[in-house]
Regions:
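Bacterial N-terminal signal peptides that target proteins for export
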Residues: 2-13
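Conserved beta-strand segments of alpha/beta enzyme cores
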Residues: 69-71, 141, 188, 341
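Bacterial N-terminal signal peptides
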Residues: 12-23
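Conserved catalytic region of serine esterases and O-acyltransferases that act on ester linkages
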Residues: 208, 215, 225-281, 303-306, ...
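Conserved SGNH/GDSL esterase-like catalytic core that processes O-acyl groups on lipids
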Residues: 40-43, 49-126
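Sec-dependent signal peptide cleavage junction
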Residues: 22-34
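Alpha-helical cap/lid subdomain in secreted, periplasmic
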Residues: 97-218, 230
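Extracytoplasmic soluble-region selector
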Residues: 275-396
Length: 396
């Protein structure tokens, strides 16, 4: 009797395990089908911060390594502003206009000139307003590529005053205004600049800039590509096989990046901070709540990182791209609590609970609130506060 029971128990256990693996396989397959059965058409529009180091091709490499079919097109010109790309009488603006009116797209990645975002944010908004109509009609989702600040700060003309802003101050303005514009048009923000600052904070020995202290190094462009990849597909780049000297690095675009540093860039771009609503409309005096979520696929991968690094050969680097390979195993996720905190840009207009995200709209107008983590992630949401209508009773 016991022998028969054991026999049936083994059969039942085998059936259960078989069903489990079938279910897991089905879920993985269903997730992959979402990407493998479609070819995504993606257009990049920007200046040198987009085309330096062939960053859009790096993005394509990440897609290829993850078996995501995509066609990537770029329209770029050095120093250009979105207002020029939005002008169809401009040489490159005409190319953008033709690309958006004669084709359908899945995503259009826009990158604004940093000086415009700091000095003339309304000009950037007007340009995006023009481009958004074309993007929407082309069936695409708009993505704002938020770039890094100057490494050593810079002087800007703000409200007729010449002000020197540090890299941190520039990054704050760039991030806030990029989110402000994206929120207005239901766009996504690829916060590469935020991730740059996180690398500079936690891995100061990694070379993230060219010698001009403005444009990204190859490592910096790889971080940007990883950030945009995660933003568009909501798919972590952590563990992606598009790595230096891999079969997917066909053009040797990232051969100058050490394996260790490439994995760090993937790790930094892996974690994201998301808000349940990036644009909320409420009435003055109304109470409401926003919820932010921190996401990361990371676990302690120090052993895997070390094993992979040992397999890496030393690469020859030009003097402009020579970087320091980080030798520590600091995990930027595990060393932070990543507790989410809230704050209002204008506390006199929006009163928000720093812990819960519950807020009260105090004044009519559009205002931003931000959620942050101690690991340096930041996300802005726009609250559109309407003046309540007043009802009048007329007695005859």
């Amino acid at each position: 009797m016991k022998t028969r029971f054991r026999k049936y128990s083994k059969i039942l256990f085998g059936v259960i395990m078989m069903l489990y693996f079938v279910a897991v396989s089905h879920n993985v397959y269903a997730d992959d089908v979402q990407f493998t059965q479609k070819t995504y058409k993606i257009l990049f529009v920007g200046n040198s911060h987009t085309y330096y180091n062939d960053m859009p091709k790096m993005f394509k490499g990440l897609c290829d390594a993850d078996k995501i079919n995509c066609e990537v097109t770029s329209i770029t010109s050095p120093g250009y502003k979105l207002s020029q790309f939005a002008d169809k009488t401009n040489m490159y603006g005409s190319q953008v206009y033709q690309a958006l009116t004669n084709n359908t797209w899945d995503y259009v990645v826009l990158q604004e000139n940093r000086a415009v975002l700091v000095e003339k944010e309304e000009e950037a908004e007007a340009a995006v307003n023009t481009l958004y109509t074309l993007i929407h009609n082309a069936g695409a989702k708009m993505v704002i590529y938020a770039t890094q600040p100057n490494n050593i700060g810079s002087t800007f003309k703000v409200d007729s005053l010449s002000l020197f802003l540090s890299d941190f101050q520039i990054e704050q303005i760039l991030t806030r205004n990029n989110f402000k514009i994206a929120d207005e048009y239901d766009g996504l923000v690829a916060a590469s600049g935020t991730n740059f600052m996180r690398v500079m904070q936690d891995y100061p020995k990694i070379t993230m800039y060219k010698t001009d202290n403005l444009h990204p190094s190859v490592t910096g462009s790889y971080l940007a590509a990883c950030t945009i990849y995660n933003t568009i597909f909501d798919r972590s780049p952590y563990g992606n096989k598009y790595l230096p000297n891999s079969e997917y690095d066909k053009d040797n675009l990232i051969s100058k990046v050490s394996m260790k540093n490439a994995l760090i860039m993937q790790k930094i771009a892996d974690s994201r901070l998301k808000v349940d609503s990036y644009y909320t409309t409420v009435s003055k005096g109304q109470n409401s709540k926003l919820t932010a979520t921190f996401t990361s696929t990371q676990t302690d991968e120090s052993e895997t990182t070390e094993d992979t690094t040992k397999k890496t050969k030393d690469e020859t680097k030009t003097s402009d791209e020579k970087e320091t390979t980080v030798t520590d195993n600091k995990d930027t996720i595990s060393t932070y609590t990543n507790k989410i905190m809230w704050d209002a840009v204008d506390a006199n207009s929006i009163s928000i609970n720093r812990i819960t995200g519950e807020f009260t709209a105090l004044k009519a107008g559009k205002y931003q609130v931000m959620s942050t983590t101690d690991s340096g992630l930041i996300c802005y949401s726009t609250i559109d506060v309407k003046q309540p209508s007043t009802a009048f009773n007329i007695n005859e």
